[in-house]
């Protein structure tokens, strides 16, 4: 009985000891896992943040434009592991570290083998390093040629394994491994040597990259355009080992017998330098200010632009040819931008004729330079006028000497054409009609319109006045491209996009669809310069406008064709003048050279441009642009916005009853047997003067001083042209007697005299077209009225202010 109790006690005691041991083991295991969890949860920087990264700038199709250097002058792209070729990842582990997924950061067998060969047998040094140890050596810049350095490398490898997962360590190694010269990382090497991202590598390329880090200096040598013998031999040995695991890949054996193209580092592309520079600057600014950039795992590696490399090369080629061909005319520099109006993506951008030419300041991005646009803003004056009911495309405007207060614009050719339709005035770039339209605008005027369109750094509206219409302000080429794209997009303004990941913002309506359509239709009627000499018109409609800045510093052409907007500039960045810098002569030929080249390379298709439903066609009298009366001999059609466009019955053609005996206008009552009726053109006095100066005969309506309103049926009232509406005239305090304000007005052909009144007080009489000068006695508000000798009148307010 006692023996049984003793045995039972021994059994219980033994079981207790085993239970205690198991508890200790479990506690130890839990402690280890707890320590591992604590290490993983302890804050530590991502491995990608240990070293700076490069940026691969690519076009919309993924073609490399530029690979930037990291801050430490290395080419180093960070590519996530899931964007690496699986064949490359497996080949690296097969070649470098087959036990990677199982060891704790170091491989005891590998270390022992390396020590035996290096120190005992005296062979070539072998470190026995794992991928983790190689990463540790690079991150901490360790000297591992000594036993102490090797021990520190092992410790650092264990540290990495404690704080990071295997996938994170593998990803970091692949992005940090040396690939010859200053190229680091498999993703970088893939882009540099094979011009492709690492997820698109072929098997021969993947195996070649896998063996380079073991001896990069010998396996990658500069100046070669294919892999050298040392690299090919190492790759093929790895391929033999690869086949033991993947016998199905034996079908690729012929590829391993062929030379493998390998781009030398010196041949890295440097395309679209101005556009890439702008995109990188915008990216850096965005990353500085945007919190979203911190969460963008691919932000440092790849910048996808909206550029099309083929279109970029075409634009660069055409500019280079044009500048070379026109060198004798003093043309040294040019710039251009091409924008797709459908998504506002910049497809090609050339900031200068030669980025590397210091003589022309070639590194300046001309598309961002603020310069006088000349007449390229005129289409928007007319479009605003359409929306505000000032005119329609066939409105007849006056191209005559006109003073708008102190501002008296002249035309580029120094001549005046008299009556001209709005369409012809725009396409022939007449200054006086454009300024008159601008003077009639209310809100928005051109200045407010440009502000709404995002044009920056404008001076005050008072600084420019009406001169803004003719290029008195400064805009950039990119501003112009966005404005012309707005016309193509039916009046909806959207900013340009250079990065593919920039969101396409909702359009902001600045013009009506009707006004935009009419303006485009006007520009479409502008013949290209070589059409006048018999050249064939473009295969697609081209909606274009030229511009020339003051003193011949800038020549511009901007326009729409197919889905694109193209703006070209010819000039000098140092603002030197050249009489050859005229828009139609210097910029338009380059513009159409580019249009023709693009159409030859890819057939351009005109997008649908349906007539807006609110836009109507109306019959007009061609001489006046108004609704035809019964005596109008030539009639046509014009676009018309019901309820907005100004329209009235024409009064240019009128019947006059002629006395058969005298040939003068007959006095009422008329004797039908002794009179007859003829149709005459009644032109205002200012236009009659232009006709006379141009030598264009105009049969004047006969007059008869013996009777009032002899034979005349109707007529237009006079129209005040000075003082200018909305202007304040300054009167100096100590020299009030020197202040004289010019009164002037145009009048109907039937008017012979004009009578001027200020606040209903008669101040003088003059002939139509002659100026009358009035001297105000005090500052204040006045009403100026003019009455012709038929009782027809016009009036407007006048403000006179004091000035020290």
Language-model segment annotations:
Residues 123-313, 410, 448-461, 466-471, ...:
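Non-catalytic, structured segments within soluble enzyme domains
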Residues 2, 36, 58, 246, ...:
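Soluble, non-transmembrane domains of envelope/secretory-pathway proteins that act on or interact
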Residues 41-87:
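Terminal hydrophobic membrane-targeting helix
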């Amino acid at each position: 009985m006692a023996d049984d109790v003793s045995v039972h006690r021994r059994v219980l005691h033994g079981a207790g000891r085993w239970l205690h041991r198991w508890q200790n083991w479990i506690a130890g295991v839990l402690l280890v896992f707890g320590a591992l969890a604590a290490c993983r949860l302890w804050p530590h920087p991502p491995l990608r943040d240990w070293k700076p990264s490069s940026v691969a700038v690519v076009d919309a199709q993924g073609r490399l434009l530029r690979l930037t250097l990291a801050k430490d002058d290395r080419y180093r792209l960070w590519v996530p592991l899931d964007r690496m070729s699986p064949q490359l990842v497996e080949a690296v582990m097969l070649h470098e570290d087959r036990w990677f997924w199982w060891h704790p950061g170091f491989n005891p067998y590998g270390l022992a083998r390396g020590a035996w060969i290096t120190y005992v047998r005296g062979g070539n040094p072998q470190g026995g390093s794992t991928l983790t140890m190689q990463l540790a050596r690079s991150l901490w810049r360790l000297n591992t040629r000594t036993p102490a350095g090797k021990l520190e490398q092992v410790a650092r490898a264990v540290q990495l394994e404690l704080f990071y997962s295997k996938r994170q360590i593998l990803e970091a190694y692949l992005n940090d491994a040396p690939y010859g010269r200053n190229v680091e990382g498999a993703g970088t090497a893939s882009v540099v040597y094979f011009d492709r991202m690492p997820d698109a590598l072929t098997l021969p390329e993947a195996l070649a990259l896998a063996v380079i880090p073991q001896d990069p200096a010998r396996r990658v040598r500069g100046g070669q355009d294919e892999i050298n013998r040392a690299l090919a031999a190492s790759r093929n040995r790895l391929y033999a080992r690869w086949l033991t695991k993947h016998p199905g890949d034996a079908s690729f054996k012929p590829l391993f017998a062929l030379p493998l193209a390998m781009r030398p580092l010196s041949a890295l592309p440097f395309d679209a330098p101005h556009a890439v520079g702008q995109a990188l600057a915008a990216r850096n600014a965005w990353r500085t200010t945007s919190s979203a950039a911190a969460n963008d795992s691919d932000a440092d590696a790849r910048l996808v632009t909206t550029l099309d490399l083929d279109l970029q090369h075409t634009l660069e080629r055409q500019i280079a040819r044009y500048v070379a061909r026109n060198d004798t005319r003093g043309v040294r520099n040019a710039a251009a931008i091409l924008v797709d109006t459908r998504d506002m993506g910049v497809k090609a951008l050339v900031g200068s004729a030669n980025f590397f030419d210091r003589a022309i300041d070639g590194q300046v991005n001309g598309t961002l330079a603020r310069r006088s646009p000349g007449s390229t803003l005129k289409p928007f004056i007319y479009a605003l006028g359409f929306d505000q009911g000032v005119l329609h495309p066939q409105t007849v405007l006056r191209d005559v000497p006109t003073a708008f207060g102190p501002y008296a614009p002249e035309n580029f050719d120094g001549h005046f054409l008299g009556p001209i339709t709005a369409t012809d005035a725009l396409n022939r770039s007449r200054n006086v009609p454009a300024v008159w339209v601008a003077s009639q605008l209310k809100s928005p005027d051109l200045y407010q319109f440009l502000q709404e369109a995002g044009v920056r750094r404008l001076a005050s509206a008072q600084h420019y006045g009406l001169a803004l219409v003719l290029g008195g302000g400064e805009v950039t080429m990119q501003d112009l491209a966005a404005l012309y794209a707005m016309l193509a997009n039916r009046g909806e303004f959207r900013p340009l996009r250079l990065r593919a990941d920039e969101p396409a913002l909702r359009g902001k309506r600045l013009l009506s669809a009707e006004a935009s359509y009419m303006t485009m239709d006007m520009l479409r009627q502008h013949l290209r310069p070589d059409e006048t000499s018999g050249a064939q018109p473009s295969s697609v409609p081209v909606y274009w406008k030229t511009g020339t800045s003051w003193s011949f510093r800038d020549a511009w052409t901007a326009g729409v064709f197919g889905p694109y907007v193209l703006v070209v500039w010819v000039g000098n960045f140092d603002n030197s003048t050249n009489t050859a810098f005229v828009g139609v002569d210097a910029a338009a030929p380059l513009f159409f050279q580019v249009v023709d080249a693009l159409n030859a390379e890819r057939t351009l298709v005109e997008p649908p441009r349906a007539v807006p439903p609110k836009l109507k066609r109306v019959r007009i009298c061609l001489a006046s642009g108004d609704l035809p009366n019964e005596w109008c001999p030539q009639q046509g059609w014009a676009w018309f916005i019901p309820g907005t466009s100004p329209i009235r019955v024409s009064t240019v053609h009128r019947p006059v009853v002629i006395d058969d005996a005298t040939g003068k206008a007959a006095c009422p009552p008329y004797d039908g047997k002794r009179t007859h009726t003829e149709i005459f053109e009644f032109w205002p006095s200012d236009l009659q003067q232009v006709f006379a100066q141009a030598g264009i005969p105009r049969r004047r309506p006969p007059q008869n001083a013996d009777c009032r309103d002899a034979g005349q049926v109707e007529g237009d009232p006079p129209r005040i042209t000075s003082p200018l509406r909305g202007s304040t005239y300054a009167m100096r305090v100590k020299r009030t007697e020197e202040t004289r304000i010019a009164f002037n007005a145009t009048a109907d052909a039937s008017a012979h005299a004009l009578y001027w009144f200020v606040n209903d007080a008669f101040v003088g009489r003059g002939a139509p077209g002659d100026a009358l000068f009035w001297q105000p006695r005090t500052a204040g508000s006045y009403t100026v009225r003019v009455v012709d000798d038929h009782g027809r009148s016009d009036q407007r307010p006048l403000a006179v202010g004091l000035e020290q």
